[in-house]
């Protein structure tokens, strides 16, 4: 049974993008880690509910939103690193635990979430 899916792929990609942006902006290591942590933590609990089993809705749109989140995480890291309470490692472990706890119908099955309610009719 799948434990990880879209939240992990998009969360990881967003996290890597935020860290890369922070590095390119010459930030310190703790700011880079904070950017990565903020980017990933906002994907915890995201359902994987591809409509009709395709990745158009909502997956591709979620990737676009994640790109903007990476930029937002960079901004937050620039100003709020000193206030951080949670480490990147804690967020990664929480992502794993959340994936294990999430009902299977929300794990790339097309049985829950948006996939359950979309009929294809207008």
How should each PLM-predicted stretch be described?
Residues 14, 19-122:
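Functionally critical mobile loop/hinge segments
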Residues 2-5:
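Short, small-residue-biased leader/transition segments that mark boundaries at the very start
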Residues 8-9:
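Glycine/charge-rich, flexible interdomain linkers and switch-proximal surface loops
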């Amino acid at each position: 049974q799948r434990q990880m899916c879209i939240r992990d792929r998009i969360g990881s990609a967003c996290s890597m993008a935020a860290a890369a942006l922070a590095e390119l902006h010459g930030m310190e290591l703790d700011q880079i880690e904070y950017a990565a942590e903020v980017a990933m933590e906002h994907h915890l609990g995201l359902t994987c509910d591809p409509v009709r089993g395709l990745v158009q809705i909502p997956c591709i749109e979620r990737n676009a939103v994640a790109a903007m989140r990476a930029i937002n995480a960079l901004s937050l890291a620039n100003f709020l690193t000193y206030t951080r309470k949670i480490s990147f490692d804690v967020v990664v472990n929480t992502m794993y635990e959340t994936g294990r706890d999430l009902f299977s119908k929300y794990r790339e099955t097309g049985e829950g979430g948006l996939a359950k309610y979309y009929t294809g009719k207008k």
